[in-house]
Amino acid sequence: MEFLKSGIKTVLGSTEPGQQPSAAETVEKLVDRVYSSTLLEDRRDACRALKALSRKYRIEVGAQGMPPLVQVLQNDGQDAEIISYALDTLCNVVTSEEFDEEADNPTVSVNVGEQFTEMFIKTPEHVTLVMGYLDEYDFRVRRAAIQLITSLISNKTRELQDLILVSPMGVSKLMDLLTDSREVIRNDVLLLLIELTKGNSNIQKIVAFENAFDRLFEIVREEGCSDGGIVVEDCLILLLNLLKNNSSNQQFFKEGSYIQRLSPMFELSQDAEEVGWSPQKVSNFHCLLQVVRALVTPSNQQQVVAACQRVMQKSRLLHALCEILMSSGVPADILTETINAVAEVVRGDRDNQDELGRVMAPSSPPRPAIVVLLMSMINEKQLLALRCAVLYCFECFLYRNADGQRAVVQTLLPSSASDVSALSTGQLLCTGLFSTDALANWFSAVALMHSLVENVALKEELLRVLLATPGGQKPITLLEQCTNLMQQERYRLQSKVGLLMLLSLWLAHCPGAVKALLETQGTMAYLTAQLCSNEHDEREFLVQGMCAFLMGLCIQFNDNSLPGQKREDISQLIIKRIGQESFCSKLAEVSRHEAYSRACKQAQIRAKSAGELLLDFEYCKLYKGLEALIAKLVSGFDVDGIELTELTLSSEASALVSQYKGIIRGMDAQIQALQQSSKELEQENAELKEKLGEEQSLKAQLLDQNTLLKAQLGASTGQVQSAQGAEATPPNEEELNAARYQANMYFAENIRLTKELETLRQQLSAEKQSADAAQDSLAAMQKDQEDLLELLADQEAKLTRYEEAGSTNTLPTSNVAPSVPAAGGGSPIPSGTASR
């Protein structure tokens, strides 16, 4: 510290005894020295002093010293030492971290670095100036420039990304630094690129096309792959930034055979269990698994996901992940993330699902991996994150896998019990469903629910499942046991939510299940009591909403085969005991709950605590599709619920009704034709949109390649012009001509694609107009049909009133009507017959 003080005195000169200048005065003198000194040595000493003061007096140095430091960068580029001082000082001023020297300075705010960053980048040329010093090979200058740009990006990411994009060869300069032989420079550039590529797809594409994947894999290999240090982690984080939510880079990664280069990194050594997992290896493996998931996450384009899943199976990456699943000594967080990765690799791919189904755990006796995972899921001693991951993996294993769903249900049927002592998926799910652990109840109910998704035949099969009862009594069905558990007071709310989800998905589109539920004793009374209760707890509101939804399913999918439990009977029960408005209000409580908004976002189950596990993605999808229909159905019933039939009408009224029905049938035929036409137009519209998306993606790739070619062309032109008048050698001229020709070809292709894109847009617009016209016509026809139905109802009501009035007026007089002599002296004819 004394050396620092003596250095500053050397620059500023000695002061009078007893007069200690303030920090602001000291900085002001140093700034004046930088501005006014003609000797380079004096300016260099002043910059060195400013750098020393910038850690403790950041505000003073930043407020006064930024303009002279920029001036140094502009004018003294030939001296590497003064440039390094200027860059280091600016880096200290704009950094977001707090220095130990300024910890006791109350004037330094938390975001002071961000404020100085904003001041610095107000002039875009400042960033270009700093970028220029990346070409300087001197270690101090290059590293200081990299660190300054990194600090600027971390403070103002979006603004710096835009400035670097327009900077000449900006991204290319940064990518070239990855090949620097000095590891410190290379590692700092990795940190810079991590900040630069966050959330900017254009920069991500440029970095990827600058051969980033090859360079990153080379660095990872040199550093020891997953057993390497923190540099490996930085490379994988950058790789993750390039792939996440970027379909172009994902396609490029797949087509470049980089997935095959990931597979060896997941192979564990023979002595891995003995050596153990270091904290850095855990971090590296976690990043590797996130890279895999970035390629196959369900939010990606479906064709990209399917292609990556096939490659992962062929390259044995899935096999390596399954080996990790079954290995011992794997840390819990790595095991959890591996289960999530396996889940997304197999989701919707039958070959991958079959391979996972064939994996056997190294136990005695050997058991399928799925069974071992389910054992962990229903074990309350396991970590919550691990149990959630197992459920997600089981859901993905059953997703669009009818054979897998059937295998689960078959293990519950009596005829499938070939080995009573062997554990099966069905037995484990029933064990969890009837456990005393509420979380195990919820997990098992959701898992069993997913074995029924979009499979009505299995819903019918599951009705045949019988459960033994204590005391040798008559066995009861699984559905009956679920309703019994739901009605028990000791059954916790989370368990009830799981059962309500299972029953709702079971009943949807399955009249047989609805009939079985209505036949169970006390179920409808319990649901009615739940809806009539006045609870004020948010979770009780959710249960009431789910009970209303289950009751609505009993109306919607009721085949009217049970006397006293028909659609009209249940509707009258709702109207008289609950009320239509109250029922619809409680039905809507599900969508108002925060658990609904969480579950709707994604299929993966995420929860910080066990209490957050309430609703599942598939249940929310079912509720979203049927809620409005059920509300409309219940609201449409009258209090009396009496419907007129054609048998109660006269011949004239029946003829009128038949006429109206004929009109309605004709309108129905027209509506169906319009709906079919609308579906065809929508399908054609979807195909055009898909084709348009492909063209836009191709255009984006061509634009990226065009940008690179422009950059290469500019670099080639600069090399030719800097040849100091010497004639260009034939190879350079040929390369330049080839580059120009290729650029022209890309320009022409770009123009062609633009025209084709415009044509597709016009076609899409025309199809949309046609679809809108069809929709308008359909709406008009539906309105006419509704008007006719209302008119028909009015006519029927009038006819009924007329018939009642007529019967009241004519019946008494017909009993006393006199006889009229018939012509020719025949027998008398009653007046009623004569009138007819």
Curated annotation (Swiss-Prot):
Main location: cytoplasm
Coiled-coil annotated spans: 663-707, 744-806
Annotated ARM repeat ranges: 24-64, 65-124, 126-166, 169-210, 211-256, 316-359, 368-413, 424-463, 477-518, 523-577, 579-636
Gene3D superfamilies, A to Z: Leucine-rich Repeat Variant
Annotated InterPro entries: ARM-like, ARM-type_fold, Armadillo, P115_Arm_rpt, Uso1_p115_C, Vesicle_P115, Vesicle_Uso1_P115_head
A GO CC term attached to the entry: endoplasmic reticulum membrane
Compositional bias per record (Low complexity), positions renumbered to this chain: 817-836
Region (Disordered): 1-22, 803-836
Keywords: Coiled coil, Cytoplasm, Endoplasmic reticulum, Golgi apparatus, Membrane, Repeat
Superkingdom: Eukaryota
Subcellular location: Cytoplasm; Golgi apparatus, Golgi stack; Golgi apparatus, Golgi stack membrane; Endoplasmic reticulum
Keyword Repeat: yes
Protein topology in the membrane: Peripheral membrane protein
Annotated signal peptide: none
Biological function: Essential for maintaining the architecture of the Golgi stacks and for normal organization of the transitional endoplasmic reticulum (tER). Required for both the formation of the Golgi stacks and the maintenance of the individual cisternae.
Name recorded for this polypeptide: General vesicular transport factor p115
Organism per entry: Drosophila melanogaster
